Every structure is written in structure tokens, then in C-alpha cells.
């Protein structure tokens, strides 16, 4: 929370003299990310956005009480965090690339769809198969986001003359975001190969 607060102060200081309208939008979108993070961590600390779920039959942790309430610890609030923070990142990147509104809208809608269906995958307890169906739908939305980032916006950035900085941020974003579906599949929500603590730290690092 403290780190996010310091980030906000730094962004406000750096953007105090920004006058170009597009640059202002990029600045505001970037500023929203640590603001959302503060809300997320506050919800986590207060226990508002976490819970214990009983995994469905077929899941590796089915019938195993990993918490005092007899279920698997599930910090589901992080999906809400991503549903607000990742669109802001995409808006900043899209504006930096000089993209049009159609591509920007498509990327943001696909991103929100990815997060919401990811939440559905995490909260589904009636069927192990349905968890993976939701996961597959979420990954399909993710493919749309990746296509726009890697193909469409890369071309737009060349035209806008911002290719150097955009490509750097693009690679960083894609590499980090690829970790989410991987850790979901290997973590307690999926195959349960990795411990909950490991996946939580991994998500925090990304």
C-alpha cells in the first residue's frame, strides 16, 4: 500500500506540467493503476476480497480443508483489481501507439472479458470441467489482447513515431501477462501443482 502511495505521488509530480491532451490521458491512465492497487490491497488486508472455497470433484484439492472454514483460500478480489488496472495499462499503451478508438475499445473490452471470465473460473465450484471451460474462454479473450498489442498497435506505433518506447513497454507487458494464465493453470485454482503462497507471490511480482 505504501509503495503504491509513493508511486501516486511520483506520478503526480512528474505529470504536473503535462499539457498535451493525449499525454494527459496517458498520464491519468497510468495514475489509475496504483490507485486501484491501493484499493485492492486494502480489500485483501481487511478480508473483504478473500474467501474459502470447496473445490469440485476431480480437483486436486477437492475435499481438502486448506483453511479454518474447510475450503481452499481464494483471494478472488485480485480479478476485480485486474479488471480495473489492466484496461488502464492498455489505454496508456494504445494512446502511446497512436491507435484509433476502435482498436482501443476492442482491446479494453477483451481485457475486461478476460478478467471477468477468469473470476468465473476461480469461483466455479459446481464442476471442475467448467472451471477449465471458463479458463479457456478467458484465454481466448487474452489472445485478442495479445494480437492487438503485438500486431495492430506495433504498426500504429511505427506510424506515430513512438515505436522504440512502445516496443519496450509492449514486450514487458506481454512477458509479465503471460505469467497469469500459466500460474493459474499450475496453481491451486487449476492443477494445484504449485502452492498457494507461491502463486500469490508470483501474481504480486507480475
Swiss-Prot record:
Where does the source fall among the domains of life? Archaea
Cellular component, GO, one term: plasma membrane
Q: Which PROSITE patterns match?
A: BACTERIAL_OPSIN_1 (PS00950)
Q: Name one Pfam family in it.
A: Bac_rhodopsin
List the Extracellular topological domains: 46-75, 125-127, 187-195
Q: Name one GO molecular function term.
A: photoreceptor activity
Q: Would I find Nuclease among this entry's keywords?
A: no
Cytoplasmic topological domain: 16-21, 98-100, 151-162
Q: Which UniProt keywords apply?
A: Cell membrane, Chloride, Chromophore, Ion transport, Membrane, Photoreceptor protein, Receptor, Retinal protein, Sensory transduction, Transmembrane, Transmembrane helix, Transport
| Role according to the record | Light-driven chloride pump.
Database matches in PANTHER family: BACTERIORHODOPSIN _OPSIN, NOPA (EUROFUNG), PTHR28286
Protein name in UniProt: Halorhodopsin
Species in which this protein is naturally found: Halobacterium halobium (strain mex)
The organism that produces this protein has a lineage beginning with: Archaea, Methanobacteriati, Methanobacteriota, Stenosarchaea group, Halobacteria
